[in-house]
Amino acid sequence: MKLVLIRHGQSEWNKLNLFTGWHDVDLSQEGVVEAMTAGKRIKEAGLEFDVAFTSVLTRAIKTLNYVLEESDQMWVPVHKSWRLNERHYGALQGLNKQETAEKYGADQVQKWRRSYDTLPPLLEENDERQAKNDRRYQLLDTHAIPSGENLKVTLERVIPYWMDTIAPEIKEGRRVVIAAHGNSLRALVKFLEGISDDEIMDLEIPTGVPLVYELNDDLKPVNKYYLDK
């Protein structure tokens, strides 16, 4: 069984080196090219899908659309869930990463970005950036909407969705593609591969490059490779 993971193509805020999180930004032109290239490589590799999953953020949705279009699979059913969203960067969202490092120190910013269990500064309740002000989250219990997340909290929302919704599709023999985000995919990869809390700090997933897993019957990886050529 094969599972394909794709981090969205470069976004406008990736290009500007800004913390993005749940802020909804579009793909950059380079990101569009990355997504289209991913779709072409998937087609060349002969990978076919029966069902697709993505977040509710534009950059991931558009990446998936380009992938399916370029691989001639636009008809594949797509399921969107906030549980596949990027990690919520709290009050860091919208700030420049380099300027934040100069203000707080590179070590502190590295912990906010890469540590498994260090939370970023949280959004204030009345901050206009709160996700509760966004219509796509209005049906969620307000207690489920974060004001900031670390990777641990991100994993705690991603993995139940994997277990309850995605994994059963794979076990039924359906071929799955997931287009999501750097940290929601890091959380899933950590779970699939059994990566330790310390080792996960060093894992980087490139934008717009399909990551193919070959899974056994227990959905444990027996092989993985990037479609980067």
From Swiss-Prot:
GO terms for molecular function: phosphoglycerate mutase activity. It is an enzyme of class 5 (isomerase). Substrate binds at residues 7-14, 20-21, 59, 86-89, 97, 113-114, 182-183. Pfam families: His_Phos_1 (PF00300). The record marks 181 as: Transition state stabilizer. The active site is at residues 8, 86. One of its GO terms (biological process) is glycolytic process. It catalyses: (2R)-2-phosphoglycerate = (2R)-3-phosphoglycerate. Pathway: Carbohydrate degradation; glycolysis; pyruvate from D-glyceraldehyde 3-phosphate: step 3/5. Keywords: Gluconeogenesis, Glycolysis, Isomerase. InterPro entries: His_Pase_superF_clade-1, His_PPase_superfam, PG/BPGM_mutase_AS, Phosphogly_mut1. Disulfide bonds: none annotated. Its EC number is 5.4.2.11. Catalyzes the interconversion of 2-phosphoglycerate and 3-phosphoglycerate. Belongs to the phosphoglycerate mutase family. BPG-dependent PGAM subfamily. This is 2,3-bisphosphoglycerate-dependent phosphoglycerate mutase.
